[in-house]
């Protein structure tokens, strides 16, 4: 049986793919001379390429990031964290672009996570806590409550907001200069190499990080036994923008007007 969280994650992923297909279909149907929408978007993630749609116009790259809404989730998953190397590793596959962006922002929380682990290592019974090497981690139930009371958990469970400069730099590195957002339209990011009559994207990405304990009951083999709980780390990104464009690539008539086929 699927968990509700997994169901929602899969539903969001399907909604994103459906919107990519809608944009690709509209770009094909518009029949703009010189506009090649590229390959049809498909399920699964690729570590190569640039943008959700790799189009071209008159032989020039027209790589486009596609987001279904202006409050779109940018992927999310549970992460392992290694205290020694400071490396975050996703427990499941996700879009490489979104993954890189999430991890870049998540690194801002490394110090707070390290402080949590350092404090956890000093909890009683020390012989079982001192070997904590990262996340997931296991601590005594009493220790979990103490870490929360002392403010270590709250410092991790805070949203991190990134500026539009962060977004621009992230996508421009991959040769992506355009983003189409459902119900908001087409924007350029940083540069506008095709000189399209669209505005610059104004927005931010909010990274939501949560260290959460499971409901499962565990223990340490002391005498008497010490009740314990395990915790995992989840990171979720969300695009937030109030920008509006006069053109959207999900609309055939907009595409024709954008490229001067119709006035």
Language model features: what each stretch is:
Residues 7-25, 42-48:
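A short, highly charged nucleic-acid-interacting micro-segment common to nuclease
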Residues 11-12, 29, 35, 65-229, ...:
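Catalytic cores of nucleic-acid endonucleases
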Residues 6, 25, 29, 257:
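Charged/polar, solvent-exposed surface patches and flexible loops
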Residues 25-59:
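A short acidic/basic microdomain associated with nuclease active sites
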Residues 45-47, 52-72, 244-245, 255-257:
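Active-site beta-strand-loop-beta-strand hairpin of nuclease catalytic cores
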Residues 234-263:
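Charge-dense, extended regions
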Residues 2, 94, 139, 247-250:
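Short coil/turn linker and secondary-structure boundary residues
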Residues 1-10, 255:
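Intrinsically disordered, compositionally biased, charge-dense segments
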């Amino acid at each position: 049986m699927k968990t509700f969280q997994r169901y929602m994650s899969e539903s969001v992923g399907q909604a994103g793919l459906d919107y990519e297909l809608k944009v690709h279909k509209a770009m094909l149907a518009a029949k703009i001379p010189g506009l090649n929408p590229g390959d049809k978007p498909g399920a699964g993630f690729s570590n190569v390429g640039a943008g959700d749609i790799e189009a071209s116009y008159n032989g020039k790259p027209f790589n486009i990031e596609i987001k279904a809404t202006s409050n779109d989730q940018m992927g999310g998953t549970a992460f392992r964290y290694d205290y020694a190397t400071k490396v975050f590793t996703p427990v499941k596959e996700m879009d490489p672009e979104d993954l890189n962006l999430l991890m870049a922002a998540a690194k801002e929380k490394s110090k707070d996570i390290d402080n949590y682990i350092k404090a956890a290592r000093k909890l009683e019974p020390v012989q079982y806590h001192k070997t904590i090497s990262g996340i997931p981690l296991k601590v005594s139930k009493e220790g979990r409550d103490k870490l929360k009371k002392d403010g270590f958990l709250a410092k991790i469970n805070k949203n991190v907001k990134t500026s539009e400069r962060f977004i621009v730099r992230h996508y421009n590195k991959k040769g992506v200069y355009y983003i189409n957002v459902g119900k908001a339209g087409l924007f350029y990011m940083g540069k506008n190499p095709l000189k399209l009559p669209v505005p610059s994207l104004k927005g931010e990405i909010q990274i939501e990080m949560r260290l959460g304990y499971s409901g499962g009951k565990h223990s340490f083999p002391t005498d008497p036994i010490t009740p314990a709980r395990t915790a995992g780390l989840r990171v979720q990104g969300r695009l937030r923008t109030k920008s509006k464009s006069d053109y959207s690539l999900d609309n055939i008539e907009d595409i024709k007007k954008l490229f001067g086929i119709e006035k």
